[in-house]
Curated annotation (Swiss-Prot):
Substrate binds at residues 74-76, 112-113. Keywords: Lyase, Molybdenum cofactor biosynthesis. The lineage of its organism: Bacteria, Pseudomonadati, Campylobacterota, Epsilonproteobacteria, Campylobacterales. This is Cyclic pyranopterin monophosphate synthase. Its EC number is 4.6.1.17. Pathway: Cofactor biosynthesis; molybdopterin biosynthesis.
Amino acid sequence: MKLSHLDEKNHPKMVDVSDKNITSRMATASGVIYMSQEAFDVIKNNTAKKGPVLQTAIVAAIMGAKKTSEIIPMCHPLMLSKIETDIVEFVKECAFKLIVTVKCEGKTGVEMEALSGVSIGLLTIYDMIKAIDKSMRITDIVLESKEGGKSGKFVRY
């Protein structure tokens, strides 16, 4: 299999998408952060010294999705038309699952934007609570689904 991000001399390159059709693209990604009961309670009770953790993580996820092409070298800058977030609490496990959905009309997909949004959002939670729990674990950052483009539809489950 030939990698599209390498030229004939094996040098990195950004893929030329100028001949591709503009189509509707959408991707959803998710990830989970596990923490101590104390850290979970601080987030739930909105008593973190750095401010409202989950609300800040949502803003960070949106910013992370928007800035993807600036931090992932071969990603194309995209005009995103929608970024939606959701946070699911797992009380028994002391965990939060962050879900990010990104949409655009473009020539290339938005999977990396969704994955970046999740990663940055979860890292923001870690940053805001690390004084309480340095053993937090960020895990299972995955692409849940994607639509549009040549490769069509993908759904994890």
